[in-house]
Swiss-Prot record:
One Pfam family this sequence matches: Aminotran_3
EC class: isomerase
Catalysed reaction equations from the record: (S)-4-amino-5-oxopentanoate = 5-aminolevulinate
Chain positions found as N6-(pyridoxal phosphate)lysine: K269
An MF annotation (GO) of this entry: glutamate-1-semialdehyde 2,1-aminomutase activity
InterPro entries reported in the protein's UniProt record: 4pyrrol_synth_GluAld_NH2Trfase, Aminotrans_3, Aminotrans_3_PPA_site, PyrdxlP-dep_Trfase, PyrdxlP-dep_Trfase_major, PyrdxlP-dep_Trfase_small
GO term, biological process aspect, one: chlorophyll biosynthetic process
Organism annotation: Chlorobium phaeobacteroides (strain BS1)
Protein name: Glutamate-1-semialdehyde 2,1-aminomutase
Length: 431
């Protein structure tokens, strides 16, 4: 068991000045218990905490570090920009054109793109744009899909898909809730009912084509195709939220992997290479409604700043030129098969979902295809599993409902270590 004396001291101090002691709730370890770990350094596939403990990192800053932490090409590019160019100007820069052009080349849906500072900004802006473009107010989202902390997304359906949304967080107005409708993931009929009951009122349907904040739940291809067809028929803007799965499950994201093209796409995480960046883009006809060429307002003081764009641009170039995806698939499949073998040896049959290098081991025997099936997990068992893995130097997300990210810099030795730790941790979970 790692000694966390310094982390515990820092957490107590942090709680005096920061709500809950953290700047994002999942970091507080409420789901798994114990002391939140304060990190001091990251290098490659590993992190070291303030107490000197080292961990193999399967969180990867919640997704961005597909190439590992402190990648030499990325850090060198950042250093060059920092020392020779600057951090921000609040003016157009040539690098904005370069990354925009690259995105149009690698993401199927993108004809024009606007850079922002976070995934939440991207999704909020995309929904506003869809409303402006269609002249409609309501949106459909899916239970269990996370689109950031914008008011429109913090809505959960009531007892059924036809009920009006109720705010899922204080501070979200009833008016906002009324304009957000929830459908069931992977269930096209639940969507059709909402569209029929709100004829000509739906501006957008927004979906994570690979849901990553209810564990990992892939959309079924026929479900996504049915959404695409329905949106085309009804004049609804289809938005793929690829903040997490974009550039992760394929270079062109889930839309490349599935072969289904949305009208708008939101991006984040990997596109920033570890620095705060988001983007939204799509059809030229829709994007031309964005100010200043159009009437849908969107702006940002630090949008397109050279430091963040440098990290993102270098990351995308490496992914394009080096094509780590076949090797990422091999590594993630090795873990999946190793975990399955371990469960077979122990007489367990928990569910694993995986798309490319993002995966989740669910502590349930029920196939996980949506929010309702995801919440059948045994959270106490996950907590015991988590702490056993942590004790063995494996850092996973401190929540059952998050993804496990494999990075390109993980070695076969790292993977074998993880499979061995999993065997021990599964037994700890059952104890």
């Amino acid at each position: 068991m790692p000694q966390l004396t310094r982390s515990a001291e820092l957490f107590e101090k942090a709680k005096q000045f920061i709500p809950g002691g953290v700047n994002s709730p999942v970091r507080a370890f409420k789901s798994v218990g114990g002391t939140p770990i304060f990190m001091a350094k990251g290098q490659g596939a590993y992190m070291t905490d303030v107490d000197g403990n080292t961990y193999l990192d399967y969180v990867g800053s919640w997704g961005p570090f597909i190439l590992g932490s402190m990648h030499p090409r990325i850090t060198a590019a950042i250093e060059n920009t920092l020392t020779k160019i600057g951090t921000s100007f609040g003016t157009p820069i040539e690098m904005e054109i370069e990354i925009a052009e690259l995105l149009t080349q690698i993401v199927p849906s993108i004809e024009m793109v606007r850079m922002v500072n976070s995934g939440t900004e991207a999704t909020m802006s995309a929904v506003r744009l869809a409303r402006g473009y269609t002249g409609r107010d309501k949106i459909i989202k899916f239970e269990g899909c996370y689109h950031g902390h914008g008011d429109s997304f913090l809505i959960k359906a009531g007892s059924g898909a036809l009920t009006l949304g109720a705010p899922d967080s204080p501070g979200v107005t009833k008016g906002t809730a009324n304009d957000t409708l929830n459908a069931k993931y992977n269930d096209i009929e639940s969507v059709r009912v909402l569209v029929k009951e709100n004829k000509d009122s739906i501006a957008a349907i927004i979906i994570e084509p690979v849901a990553g904040n209810t564990g990992v739940i892939p959309a079924k291809t026929d479900f996504l195709q049915a959404l695409r067809d329905l949106c085309t028929e009804e004049g609804i803007v289809l938005i793929f939220d690829e903040v997490m799965c974009g550039f992760r499950v394929a270079l062109g994201g889930a839309q490349e992997r599935y072969g289904i093209t949305p009208d708008l796409t939101t991006m984040g995480k990997i596109i920033g290479g570890g620095l705060p960046v988001g983007a939204f883009g799509g059809k030229r006809e829709i994007m031309q409604r964005v100010a200043p060429i159009g009437d849908v307002y969107q702006a940002g003081t630090l949008s397109g700043n050279p430091l963040a764009l440098t990290a993102g641009l270098e990351t995308l170039k490496i992914l394009r030129d080096d094509n780590p995806y076949p090797e990422l698939e091999r590594k993630a499949a090795f873990l999946e098969e190793g975990f399955r073998d371990n469960m077979n040896k122990l007489g367990l049959s928990y569910v694993q979902n995986r798309v490319g290098s993002m995966a989740c081991l669910f502590f349930t025997e029920t196939p996980v295809e949506n929010y309702d099936t995801a919440i059948t997990c045994d959270l106490k068992k996950y907590g015991k599993y988590y702490h056993s893995m942590l004790d063995q130097g494996i850092y996973l997300a401190p929540s059952q409902f998050e993804a496990m990210f494999t990075s390109a810099v993980m070695t076969d030795e790292d993977l074998e270590k993880t499979v061995k730790a999993n065997y021990v941790a599964l037994q700890a979970a059952e104890a």
